[in-house]
Amino acid sequence: MLKFLRGHAHQVYTALAVLRMNDERLVMDLCVTDVPMRNYSDGELETYVLTGDPLDKAGAYAIQHPGFHPVENMKGCYASVMGLPLCHLIRVLRTLDVALGTDVPAACQSLLQYQCPVSRAILRGEQIG
C-alpha cells in the first residue's frame, strides 16, 4: 500500500453522523481531503514498517507519525486524515444548536502544530477538506 501511495496524492473520506436523542434528529457530513504523499525512500519505508505502526492504520500510515512524515505540502484537513475532522464535527453540532465554549479550530491547530488553511471555509459551510 505505501509503495503504491509513494509520490502520489490520494483522497481520504471521513463521514460523520450525529444523532440528537431527544428528537431523533440525525445530521451527517462528509470531509474529503486530498493527501499528497512524499517520495519517501525504500529505506524509510522499511524502517517505518518495522515499527509496526502501519499495521493498524487505514492506508497503512499515520500522518502524525513523528519519524516517518509520509505527507508533504498538506493543504487540507489534517485532523480528518488522523480520523476525526473537528471543524466538520463543529459544523454538525452547530446545526443541532450545540454551543461549544472552546475555540476548537484554534485548539486543533495548536495541538497538531498545523496552520489549517481550510478551517474557516469549512465552518462557513463550504464543501472542502
Predicted regions and their residues:
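Anionic-ligand binding patches
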Residues: 1-129
